[in-house]
Amino acid sequence: MIAHRAPSPIDKLAVAVVHEPARAANAYAPLPAGAREEALRFLLQTAADAGVTLVATRPDGDGERRLGQAWPFPSPFQVTVRTVSIAEGVDRVEARARRSLERLGLPRGDALLVERADDLAGAEGRALWDRLEALKARGLYRRIGFRACVEDGPALLARRFQPDVVELPINLLDQRIQHTGVLAELAALGVAVHATSVFADGLLFISGEPLPPEMAGHAHALSRIRRRLAEARIDPMQATLAYVMGLPEVSAVIASVASAAELRAVVAAANAQTPALDWAALQLEPATAAAAGSSLQGRGRISSAA
């Protein structure tokens, strides 16, 4: 008889590797090439050892090639790949999606995601989607979908294109995707949801440092939320992971990490006991979240915390 293990929070955890961490210029000295490659191999091995099975990638820079040279063997990972902009033409989008797999050293990918919802809403949206469907039919990608935010109307796009996966920014500070019913609508359509920007660009971790200019007016609200977490003796990383991982409609929670140390911190927080908190009381007001815009829908890195 095969023993079935209990579900673990790590089952939902996915990683996106930050190859060039965005930090203060004087706070970080870039590693030499050989050390950088070894650090990446160590990060991926740490992810594999922790039970992470999904890696989210992006086509810009040299990140795909670096990953392709650093996978552990045998590799336990599936990958999601993003398209380049449709401004380059649908032929270029298709060719680059194929090239991404070559650079990653993989015969196929788990999911191919349209980078911007605007690409689907435009005049060539249907032609673009047809190319993705053709790549899926040829077995190069198991699933196809798109990335969007709440302002893009992701449920409406999902009804039109019937994706397998939608990637959305969801975090403790900005809970609009949940409370506007988008998650429920996508679940009813049978669409898998991948959550990104789960750490809201590290805003909950900033203490004693200036906030980004666009968030300076929300300092009091952020301070109030941090104070409530401190009074409950809950680490901000633990709280935001628990919130997103606790959403039943979310099948993957993508954390952007720049090192094995950051990943270990994420894994420890994900495995911590789920706190009993009033999640809705820990969000920014919806109008505030909407005004904050990209600050809450950034890359979800934890550089400010690690």
Placement of each model-derived feature along the sequence:
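N-terminal binding-site loop/beta-alpha segment at the start of enzyme catalytic domains
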Residues: 1-77
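Acidic (Asp/Glu)-rich catalytic clusters
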Residues: 5-9, 67-78, 98-107, 157-161, ...
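Alpha-helix-loop-beta-strand connector modules within alpha/beta enzyme cores
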Residues: 64-82, 130-139
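Acidic-and-aromatic substrate-binding clefts and catalytic sites of carbohydrate-active enzymes
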Residues: 54-66, 86-91, 119-123, 172-178
